Curated annotation (Swiss-Prot):
Protein name in UniProt: Ig heavy chain V region HPCG14
Record bears the keyword Membrane: no
Annotated Pfam families: V-set (PF07686)
GO-annotated molecular function: antigen binding
InterPro entries linked: Ig-like_dom, Ig-like_dom_sf, Ig-like_fold, Ig_sub, Ig_V-set, IgHV
Origin: domain of life: Eukaryota
Gene3D superfamilies on file: Immunoglobulins (2.60.40.10)
Length: 123
């Protein structure tokens, strides 16, 4: 069974930092692109970060809203995806999800999601 389990969310003051984790199991972690997506209260899902697979040297990509503040990484020995979040702002308040990215031909989609972890940025 493929599983993704996020953790590390919580309440943090503006300007603070948090590190989210996504523990994965049931598939070959190194073979897949992995993504971070968030949903602010009352808003739509927003893609924020990607970690490409081993074949693509685990290179990363970020949305403009988090670039330079958030950093995605992997522990391939434990099959864990991380999201280091720095200089947090009130607008970063959201439920954060990790997702597995699959593709066939030119079509990409996220086929497995975790339950999410909540981040609240407030003083």
């Amino acid at each position: 069974e493929v599983k993704l389990v996020e953790s590390g969310g919580g309440l943090v003051q503006p300007g603070g930092s948090l590190r989210l984790s996504c523990a994965t199991s049931g598939f070959t972690f190194s073979a897949f692109y992995m993504e971070w997506v968030r949903q602010p209260p009352g808003k739509r899902l927003e893609w924020i970060a990607a970690s490409r697979n081993k074949a693509n040297d685990y290179t990363t990509e970020y949305s403009a809203s988090v670039k330079g503040r958030f950093f995605v990484s992997r522990d391939t020995s434990q099959s864990i995806l991380y999201l280091q979040m720095n200089a947090l702002r009130a607008e970063d308040t959201a439920i954060y999800y990790c997702a597995r990215d699959v593709y066939y031909g030119y079509d990409y989609w996220f086929d497995v999601w975790g339950a999410g972890t909540t981040v609240t940025v407030s003083s």
